[in-house]
Swiss-Prot record:
Binding site for L-serine: 231-233, 285, 385
Name of the gene encoding the protein in the UniProt record: serS
Catalytic reaction annotation: tRNA(Ser) + L-serine + ATP = L-seryl-tRNA(Ser) + AMP + diphosphate + H(+); tRNA(Sec) + L-serine + ATP = L-seryl-tRNA(Sec) + AMP + diphosphate + H(+)
Key word Repeat present: no
InterPro entries attached to this UniProt entry: aa-tRNA-synt_IIb, aa-tRNA-synth_II, aa-tRNA-synth_II/BPL/LPL, Ser-tRNA-ligase_type_1, Ser-tRNA-synth_1_N, SerRS_1_N_sf, SerRS_core, tRNA-bd_arm
Highest taxon of source: Bacteria
GO biological process: selenocysteine biosynthetic process; seryl-tRNA aminoacylation
Positions annotated to bind ATP: 262-264, 349-352
Pathway(s) annotated for this protein in UniProt: Aminoacyl-tRNA biosynthesis; selenocysteinyl-tRNA(Sec) biosynthesis; L-seryl-tRNA(Sec) from L-serine and tRNA(Sec): step 1/1
Name the record gives this protein: Serine--tRNA ligase
Entry's Gene Ontology molecular function annotations: ATP binding; catalytic activity, acting on a protein; serine-tRNA ligase activity; transferase activity
Domain remark text: Consists of two distinct domains, a catalytic core and a N-terminal extension that is involved in tRNA binding.
Function: Catalyzes the attachment of serine to tRNA(Ser). Is also able to aminoacylate tRNA(Sec) with serine, to form the misacylated tRNA L-seryl-tRNA(Sec), which will be further converted into selenocysteinyl-tRNA(Sec).
Keyword tags: Aminoacyl-tRNA synthetase, ATP-binding, Cytoplasm, Ligase, Nucleotide-binding, Protein biosynthesis
Amino acid sequence: MLDIKLFRNDPEFLKEKVAKRGMDSKVVDEVLELDEQRRQLISQAEEMKAERNKVSGEIAQKKRNKEDADDAIAAMRNLGDEIKVLDDTLNQVDVDLNDKLSRIPNIIHDDVPEGATDEDNIEVKRWGTPRTFEFEDKAHWDLVEELEMVDFERAAKVSGARFVFLTGDGAQLERALMNYMITKHTTQHGYTEMMVPQLVNADSMYGTGQLPKFEEDLFKVEKEGLYTIPTAEVPLTNYYRNEIIAPDVLPAKFTAQSACYRSEAGSAGRDTRGLIRLHQFDKVEMVRIEKPEDSWQALEDMTHHAEAILEELGLPYRRVILCTGDIGFGSSKTYDLEVWLPSYNDYKEISSCSNITDFQARRSNIRFKRDKNAKPELAHTLNGSGLAVGRTFAAIVENYQNEDGSVTIPEVLVPFMGGKTVIRPTK
Protein backbone atom coordinates (compact mmCIF):
# COMPACT_ATOMS: atom_id res chain seq x y z
CA MET A 1 0.00 0.00 0.00
CA LEU A 2 1.22 3.47 -0.82
CA ASP A 3 1.64 6.25 1.74
CA ILE A 4 -1.34 8.61 1.70
CA LYS A 5 1.16 11.47 2.08
CA LEU A 6 2.39 10.76 -1.46
CA PHE A 7 -1.08 11.47 -2.79
CA ARG A 8 -1.32 14.72 -0.85
CA ASN A 9 2.18 15.99 -1.60
CA ASP A 10 2.79 14.98 -5.22
CA PRO A 11 -0.37 13.77 -6.98
CA GLU A 12 1.01 14.48 -10.46
CA PHE A 13 4.01 12.21 -9.83
CA LEU A 14 1.67 9.44 -8.73
CA LYS A 15 -0.60 9.92 -11.72
CA GLU A 16 2.39 9.45 -14.01
CA LYS A 17 3.48 6.27 -12.20
CA VAL A 18 -0.04 4.83 -12.10
CA ALA A 19 -0.53 5.52 -15.81
CA LYS A 20 2.69 3.65 -16.62
CA ARG A 21 1.14 0.65 -14.88
CA GLY A 22 -1.81 0.81 -17.26
CA MET A 23 -4.26 2.15 -14.67
CA ASP A 24 -6.50 5.17 -15.12
CA SER A 25 -4.75 8.01 -13.30
CA LYS A 26 -8.09 9.36 -12.08
CA VAL A 27 -7.76 6.86 -9.22
CA VAL A 28 -5.34 9.36 -7.63
CA ASP A 29 -8.05 12.04 -7.64
CA GLU A 30 -10.55 9.54 -6.22
CA VAL A 31 -8.19 8.77 -3.34
CA LEU A 32 -7.63 12.48 -2.66
CA GLU A 33 -11.38 13.12 -2.68
CA LEU A 34 -11.97 10.36 -0.13
CA ASP A 35 -9.02 11.55 1.95
CA GLU A 36 -10.37 15.11 2.03
CA GLN A 37 -13.84 13.83 2.91
CA ARG A 38 -12.34 11.76 5.71
CA ARG A 39 -10.40 14.70 7.15
CA GLN A 40 -13.46 16.94 7.07
CA LEU A 41 -15.54 14.30 8.84
CA ILE A 42 -12.87 13.86 11.51
CA SER A 43 -12.77 17.63 12.06
CA GLN A 44 -16.57 17.87 12.29
CA ALA A 45 -16.74 14.91 14.67
CA GLU A 46 -14.05 16.38 16.92
CA GLU A 47 -15.86 19.73 17.04
CA MET A 48 -19.14 18.03 17.96
CA LYS A 49 -17.47 15.88 20.61
CA ALA A 50 -15.89 19.00 22.11
CA GLU A 51 -19.32 20.67 22.11
CA ARG A 52 -20.84 17.56 23.71
CA ASN A 53 -18.21 17.67 26.47
CA LYS A 54 -18.97 21.34 27.01
CA VAL A 55 -22.73 20.68 27.27
CA SER A 56 -22.06 17.76 29.60
CA GLY A 57 -20.18 20.12 31.91
CA GLU A 58 -23.03 22.61 31.77
CA ILE A 59 -25.51 19.88 32.70
CA ALA A 60 -23.40 18.91 35.69
CA GLN A 61 -23.17 22.53 36.80
CA LYS A 62 -26.94 23.05 36.48
CA LYS A 63 -27.61 19.93 38.52
CA ARG A 64 -25.22 21.10 41.23
CA ASN A 65 -27.10 24.41 41.27
CA LYS A 66 -30.45 22.56 41.25
CA GLU A 67 -31.35 24.31 37.98
CA ASP A 68 -33.46 22.93 35.11
CA ALA A 69 -31.14 20.99 32.75
CA ASP A 70 -33.77 19.49 30.42
CA ASP A 71 -32.87 21.68 27.43
CA ALA A 72 -29.18 20.95 27.83
CA ILE A 73 -29.84 17.21 28.15
CA ALA A 74 -31.93 17.29 24.96
CA ALA A 75 -29.16 19.20 23.19
CA MET A 76 -26.59 16.62 24.29
CA ARG A 77 -28.77 13.78 23.01
CA ASN A 78 -29.09 15.51 19.65
CA LEU A 79 -25.33 15.97 19.53
CA GLY A 80 -24.88 12.30 20.34
CA ASP A 81 -27.16 11.31 17.46
CA GLU A 82 -25.31 13.60 15.06
CA ILE A 83 -21.94 12.28 16.22
CA LYS A 84 -23.11 8.69 15.62
CA VAL A 85 -24.17 9.58 12.07
CA LEU A 86 -20.79 11.24 11.49
CA ASP A 87 -18.89 8.27 12.95
CA ASP A 88 -20.85 5.82 10.79
CA THR A 89 -20.15 7.94 7.71
CA LEU A 90 -16.49 8.21 8.67
CA ASN A 91 -16.20 4.44 9.11
CA GLN A 92 -17.62 3.88 5.63
CA VAL A 93 -15.28 6.47 4.11
CA ASP A 94 -12.36 4.73 5.87
CA VAL A 95 -13.43 1.42 4.34
CA ASP A 96 -13.78 2.98 0.88
CA LEU A 97 -10.44 4.77 1.14
CA ASN A 98 -8.54 1.69 2.34
CA ASP A 99 -10.15 -0.44 -0.36
CA LYS A 100 -9.15 2.08 -3.01
CA LEU A 101 -5.59 2.30 -1.67
CA SER A 102 -5.28 -1.48 -1.41
CA ARG A 103 -5.93 -1.88 -5.14
CA ILE A 104 -3.28 0.59 -6.32
CA PRO A 105 0.06 -1.05 -7.24
CA ASN A 106 3.49 -0.10 -5.99
CA ILE A 107 5.54 2.71 -7.51
CA ILE A 108 7.88 1.34 -10.15
CA HIS A 109 11.61 1.99 -10.00
CA ASP A 110 13.14 4.27 -12.64
CA ASP A 111 15.07 1.28 -14.08
CA VAL A 112 11.87 -0.52 -15.06
CA PRO A 113 11.33 -0.35 -18.84
CA GLU A 114 7.98 0.75 -20.22
CA GLY A 115 6.00 -1.88 -22.08
CA ALA A 116 2.71 -3.74 -22.33
CA THR A 117 3.61 -7.46 -22.28
CA ASP A 118 6.45 -9.86 -21.52
CA GLU A 119 7.74 -9.22 -25.04
CA ASP A 120 8.80 -5.78 -23.80
CA ASN A 121 10.96 -7.13 -20.97
CA ILE A 122 14.65 -6.29 -21.31
CA GLU A 123 17.30 -9.01 -21.27
CA VAL A 124 20.29 -7.98 -19.15
CA LYS A 125 22.25 -11.22 -18.84
CA ARG A 126 22.62 -14.62 -20.48
CA TRP A 127 24.50 -17.60 -19.08
CA GLY A 128 25.34 -20.93 -20.73
CA THR A 129 24.80 -22.20 -24.25
CA PRO A 130 21.69 -24.20 -25.14
CA ARG A 131 22.58 -27.77 -26.01
CA THR A 132 22.58 -28.94 -29.62
CA PHE A 133 21.26 -32.49 -29.71
CA GLU A 134 22.68 -35.09 -32.11
CA PHE A 135 19.44 -37.04 -31.86
CA GLU A 136 15.75 -36.17 -31.85
CA ASP A 137 15.19 -34.76 -28.38
CA LYS A 138 11.93 -35.21 -26.50
CA ALA A 139 9.77 -32.91 -24.41
CA HIS A 140 9.84 -33.47 -20.66
CA TRP A 141 6.19 -34.54 -20.57
CA ASP A 142 7.02 -37.50 -22.83
CA LEU A 143 10.31 -38.37 -21.12
CA VAL A 144 8.92 -38.42 -17.59
CA GLU A 145 6.09 -40.76 -18.55
CA GLU A 146 8.44 -43.10 -20.42
CA LEU A 147 10.74 -43.11 -17.37
CA GLU A 148 7.71 -43.68 -15.08
CA MET A 149 8.60 -40.61 -13.03
CA VAL A 150 5.06 -39.20 -13.03
CA ASP A 151 1.43 -40.22 -13.35
CA PHE A 152 -0.82 -37.50 -14.75
CA GLU A 153 -3.73 -39.81 -15.51
CA ARG A 154 -4.21 -41.03 -11.95
CA ALA A 155 -3.68 -37.51 -10.60
CA ALA A 156 -6.53 -36.35 -12.84
CA LYS A 157 -8.68 -39.15 -11.46
CA VAL A 158 -7.87 -38.22 -7.88
CA SER A 159 -7.84 -34.41 -8.12
CA GLY A 160 -8.58 -33.17 -11.63
CA ALA A 161 -6.62 -31.43 -14.36
CA ARG A 162 -3.25 -29.74 -13.65
CA PHE A 163 -2.21 -32.11 -10.86
CA VAL A 164 0.48 -34.79 -10.88
CA PHE A 165 1.72 -37.81 -8.94
CA LEU A 166 5.52 -37.90 -8.80
CA THR A 167 6.58 -41.52 -8.55
CA GLY A 168 9.81 -43.41 -7.95
CA ASP A 169 12.74 -41.58 -9.50
CA GLY A 170 10.49 -38.57 -10.09
CA ALA A 171 9.67 -38.20 -6.42
CA GLN A 172 13.32 -38.71 -5.53
CA LEU A 173 14.49 -36.06 -8.01
CA GLU A 174 11.93 -33.54 -6.71
CA ARG A 175 13.06 -34.15 -3.12
CA ALA A 176 16.72 -34.00 -4.10
CA LEU A 177 16.21 -30.63 -5.77
CA MET A 178 14.46 -29.18 -2.72
CA ASN A 179 17.13 -30.49 -0.36
CA TYR A 180 19.92 -29.19 -2.57
CA MET A 181 18.39 -25.72 -2.93
CA ILE A 182 17.66 -25.33 0.78
CA THR A 183 21.15 -26.56 1.70
CA LYS A 184 22.74 -24.12 -0.74
CA HIS A 185 20.75 -21.15 0.56
CA THR A 186 21.34 -21.95 4.24
CA THR A 187 25.01 -22.98 4.17
CA GLN A 188 26.35 -20.60 1.50
CA HIS A 189 23.89 -17.74 1.14
CA GLY A 190 23.13 -17.04 4.80
CA TYR A 191 19.38 -17.76 4.93
CA THR A 192 17.54 -19.26 7.90
CA GLU A 193 15.47 -22.29 6.99
CA MET A 194 11.79 -22.17 7.94
CA MET A 195 8.95 -24.67 7.78
CA VAL A 196 5.83 -22.60 7.17
CA PRO A 197 2.05 -22.96 7.61
CA GLN A 198 0.45 -23.69 4.26
CA LEU A 199 -2.92 -22.29 5.32
CA VAL A 200 -3.04 -18.60 6.21
CA ASN A 201 -5.71 -16.11 7.21
CA ALA A 202 -7.06 -13.20 5.19
CA ASP A 203 -4.93 -10.66 7.09
CA SER A 204 -1.79 -12.44 5.89
CA MET A 205 -3.00 -12.50 2.28
CA TYR A 206 -3.85 -8.80 2.55
CA GLY A 207 -0.42 -8.04 4.00
CA THR A 208 1.46 -9.45 1.02
CA GLY A 209 -1.00 -8.02 -1.52
CA GLN A 210 -2.93 -11.07 -2.73
CA LEU A 211 -6.14 -9.69 -1.22
CA PRO A 212 -8.37 -8.10 -2.16
CA LYS A 213 -7.29 -7.70 -5.78
CA PHE A 214 -6.29 -11.29 -6.65
CA GLU A 215 -8.74 -13.43 -4.71
CA GLU A 216 -9.82 -15.34 -7.83
CA ASP A 217 -6.28 -16.75 -8.11
CA LEU A 218 -6.47 -18.33 -4.64
CA PHE A 219 -7.91 -21.51 -3.18
CA LYS A 220 -9.99 -20.87 -0.06
CA VAL A 221 -11.10 -23.16 2.75
CA GLU A 222 -14.52 -21.58 3.19
CA LYS A 223 -15.42 -23.20 6.52
CA GLU A 224 -12.32 -21.92 8.29
CA GLY A 225 -11.85 -18.69 6.34
CA LEU A 226 -8.30 -19.72 5.46
CA TYR A 227 -6.41 -19.72 2.17
CA THR A 228 -3.85 -22.16 0.79
CA ILE A 229 -0.63 -20.30 0.13
CA PRO A 230 0.30 -19.42 -3.47
CA THR A 231 3.92 -19.11 -2.33
CA ALA A 232 5.89 -19.32 0.93
CA GLU A 233 6.41 -15.57 0.52
CA VAL A 234 3.06 -15.09 2.27
CA PRO A 235 3.81 -16.74 5.64
CA LEU A 236 7.49 -15.73 5.60
CA THR A 237 6.77 -12.04 5.02
CA ASN A 238 3.95 -12.05 7.58
CA TYR A 239 6.27 -13.57 10.20
CA TYR A 240 6.94 -10.06 11.55
CA ARG A 241 3.49 -8.60 10.81
CA ASN A 242 2.39 -6.04 13.44
CA GLU A 243 5.82 -6.13 15.08
CA ILE A 244 8.67 -3.70 15.66
CA ILE A 245 11.89 -5.53 14.82
CA ALA A 246 14.84 -5.06 17.16
CA PRO A 247 17.93 -3.22 15.83
CA ASP A 248 20.14 -6.31 15.69
CA VAL A 249 17.71 -8.53 13.73
CA LEU A 250 17.98 -6.97 10.26
CA PRO A 251 18.64 -8.13 7.69
CA ALA A 252 16.26 -11.04 8.24
CA LYS A 253 16.82 -13.69 5.54
CA PHE A 254 14.43 -16.65 5.34
CA THR A 255 14.16 -19.60 2.99
CA ALA A 256 11.48 -22.26 2.90
CA GLN A 257 10.30 -25.12 0.75
CA SER A 258 6.56 -25.45 0.43
CA ALA A 259 3.79 -26.62 -1.80
CA CYS A 260 2.17 -23.70 -3.62
CA TYR A 261 -1.46 -23.62 -4.70
CA ARG A 262 -2.81 -21.47 -7.54
CA SER A 263 -6.10 -21.56 -9.39
CA GLU A 264 -4.35 -20.29 -12.54
CA ALA A 265 -7.40 -18.19 -13.38
CA GLY A 266 -7.03 -16.75 -16.85
CA SER A 267 -4.38 -19.27 -17.96
CA ALA A 268 -6.68 -21.65 -19.84
CA GLY A 269 -4.89 -23.12 -22.82
CA ARG A 270 -1.41 -22.09 -21.65
CA ASP A 271 1.25 -24.73 -20.91
CA THR A 272 -1.38 -27.46 -20.64
CA ARG A 273 1.14 -30.31 -20.87
CA GLY A 274 3.81 -31.31 -18.41
CA LEU A 275 5.04 -29.70 -15.21
CA ILE A 276 5.14 -26.01 -16.16
CA ARG A 277 1.72 -24.84 -14.96
CA LEU A 278 0.05 -26.86 -12.19
CA HIS A 279 -2.49 -26.06 -9.49
CA GLN A 280 -0.06 -27.49 -6.89
CA PHE A 281 3.70 -27.32 -7.19
CA ASP A 282 6.79 -27.15 -4.99
CA LYS A 283 8.93 -24.07 -4.70
CA VAL A 284 11.87 -22.93 -2.62
CA GLU A 285 11.35 -19.31 -1.62
CA MET A 286 13.70 -16.61 -0.36
CA VAL A 287 12.38 -13.66 1.66
CA ARG A 288 14.40 -10.78 3.03
CA ILE A 289 13.42 -7.96 5.38
CA GLU A 290 15.86 -5.09 5.06
CA LYS A 291 16.53 -1.51 6.03
CA PRO A 292 15.40 0.77 3.18
CA GLU A 293 18.92 1.83 2.24
CA ASP A 294 20.01 -1.81 1.86
CA SER A 295 17.14 -3.22 -0.17
CA TRP A 296 18.43 -2.52 -3.68
CA GLN A 297 21.72 -4.29 -3.07
CA ALA A 298 19.73 -7.08 -1.41
CA LEU A 299 17.76 -7.52 -4.65
CA GLU A 300 20.99 -7.97 -6.60
CA ASP A 301 22.33 -10.43 -4.01
CA MET A 302 19.14 -12.48 -3.91
CA THR A 303 19.01 -12.69 -7.70
CA HIS A 304 22.61 -13.94 -7.72
CA HIS A 305 21.63 -16.58 -5.16
CA ALA A 306 18.95 -17.92 -7.50
CA GLU A 307 21.36 -17.77 -10.44
CA ALA A 308 23.94 -19.76 -8.49
CA ILE A 309 21.51 -22.70 -8.34
CA LEU A 310 20.99 -22.66 -12.11
CA GLU A 311 24.71 -22.37 -12.77
CA GLU A 312 25.64 -25.27 -10.49
CA LEU A 313 22.95 -27.35 -12.19
CA GLY A 314 24.43 -26.40 -15.57
CA LEU A 315 21.14 -25.03 -16.91
CA PRO A 316 21.36 -22.22 -19.50
CA TYR A 317 19.32 -19.19 -18.47
CA ARG A 318 18.83 -15.50 -19.02
CA ARG A 319 17.92 -12.62 -16.72
CA VAL A 320 15.34 -10.03 -17.75
CA ILE A 321 13.96 -6.88 -16.13
CA LEU A 322 10.18 -6.98 -16.19
CA CYS A 323 8.51 -4.06 -17.95
CA THR A 324 5.71 -1.90 -16.56
CA GLY A 325 3.02 -4.08 -18.12
CA ASP A 326 4.42 -7.38 -16.81
CA ILE A 327 5.73 -6.50 -13.34
CA GLY A 328 3.84 -7.76 -10.30
CA PHE A 329 1.33 -5.69 -8.35
CA GLY A 330 3.49 -5.14 -5.27
CA SER A 331 6.89 -4.96 -6.90
CA SER A 332 8.96 -1.85 -7.52
CA LYS A 333 11.47 -3.78 -9.65
CA THR A 334 11.60 -7.44 -10.66
CA TYR A 335 14.20 -9.64 -12.30
CA ASP A 336 12.92 -12.82 -13.91
CA LEU A 337 15.28 -15.72 -14.49
CA GLU A 338 14.26 -17.82 -17.47
CA VAL A 339 15.67 -21.31 -18.04
CA TRP A 340 16.21 -22.83 -21.48
CA LEU A 341 13.65 -25.51 -22.33
CA PRO A 342 14.40 -27.32 -25.62
CA SER A 343 10.75 -28.41 -26.02
CA TYR A 344 9.74 -24.75 -26.32
CA ASN A 345 12.93 -23.73 -28.11
CA ASP A 346 12.77 -20.79 -25.75
CA TYR A 347 13.45 -19.57 -22.22
CA LYS A 348 10.72 -20.04 -19.59
CA GLU A 349 10.40 -18.29 -16.23
CA ILE A 350 11.88 -20.25 -13.34
CA SER A 351 12.41 -17.48 -10.77
CA SER A 352 11.17 -13.98 -10.00
CA CYS A 353 13.16 -11.78 -7.62
CA SER A 354 11.49 -8.56 -6.50
CA ASN A 355 12.04 -5.56 -4.27
CA ILE A 356 8.65 -4.67 -2.79
CA THR A 357 10.14 -1.66 -0.94
CA ASP A 358 7.79 -0.59 1.91
CA PHE A 359 4.59 -1.60 0.05
CA GLN A 360 3.98 -4.84 2.00
CA ALA A 361 5.45 -3.46 5.21
CA ARG A 362 2.85 -0.67 5.27
CA ARG A 363 0.02 -3.18 4.73
CA SER A 364 1.49 -5.59 7.30
CA ASN A 365 2.78 -2.97 9.76
CA ILE A 366 6.33 -4.36 9.71
CA ARG A 367 8.61 -1.83 11.34
CA PHE A 368 12.12 -1.71 12.80
CA LYS A 369 14.19 0.47 15.10
CA ARG A 370 17.73 1.58 14.29
CA ASP A 371 18.45 1.65 18.03
CA LYS A 372 16.35 1.09 21.12
CA ASN A 373 15.49 4.79 21.46
CA ALA A 374 14.79 5.42 17.77
CA LYS A 375 11.41 6.01 16.17
CA PRO A 376 10.03 2.92 14.38
CA GLU A 377 10.37 2.93 10.57
CA LEU A 378 8.82 0.80 7.87
CA ALA A 379 11.11 -1.98 6.65
CA HIS A 380 11.58 -3.05 3.04
CA THR A 381 10.60 -6.58 1.99
CA LEU A 382 11.95 -8.66 -0.88
CA ASN A 383 11.12 -12.08 -2.22
CA GLY A 384 12.49 -14.44 -4.82
CA SER A 385 12.12 -17.99 -6.08
CA GLY A 386 15.14 -20.08 -5.41
CA LEU A 387 13.81 -21.96 -7.48
CA ALA A 388 10.47 -23.23 -8.77
CA VAL A 389 11.16 -26.93 -8.27
CA GLY A 390 8.85 -28.44 -10.89
CA ARG A 391 10.21 -26.22 -13.63
CA THR A 392 13.77 -27.04 -12.56
CA PHE A 393 12.81 -30.73 -12.71
CA ALA A 394 11.49 -30.25 -16.27
CA ALA A 395 14.60 -28.33 -17.33
CA ILE A 396 16.92 -31.05 -16.03
CA VAL A 397 15.00 -33.82 -17.77
CA GLU A 398 15.04 -31.98 -21.10
CA ASN A 399 18.60 -30.63 -20.99
CA TYR A 400 20.20 -33.79 -19.59
CA GLN A 401 18.36 -36.38 -21.71
CA ASN A 402 20.30 -39.03 -23.59
CA GLU A 403 19.66 -40.81 -26.88
CA ASP A 404 18.63 -44.05 -25.15
CA GLY A 405 15.86 -42.22 -23.27
CA SER A 406 17.76 -41.97 -20.00
CA VAL A 407 18.46 -38.77 -18.06
CA THR A 408 21.85 -37.95 -16.54
CA ILE A 409 21.74 -36.49 -13.03
CA PRO A 410 23.63 -33.17 -12.70
CA GLU A 411 26.78 -33.78 -10.68
CA VAL A 412 25.78 -31.45 -7.84
CA LEU A 413 22.58 -33.47 -7.28
CA VAL A 414 24.21 -36.92 -7.15
CA PRO A 415 24.77 -36.84 -3.34
CA PHE A 416 21.11 -35.87 -2.87
CA MET A 417 20.05 -38.77 -5.13
CA GLY A 418 21.77 -41.40 -2.99
CA GLY A 419 24.65 -41.64 -5.45
CA LYS A 420 22.45 -42.28 -8.48
CA THR A 421 23.96 -40.76 -11.63
CA VAL A 422 21.44 -41.76 -14.32
CA ILE A 423 17.69 -42.33 -14.44
CA ARG A 424 17.02 -45.12 -16.93
CA PRO A 425 13.89 -46.55 -18.52
CA THR A 426 12.58 -49.50 -16.53
CA LYS A 427 11.40 -51.36 -19.63
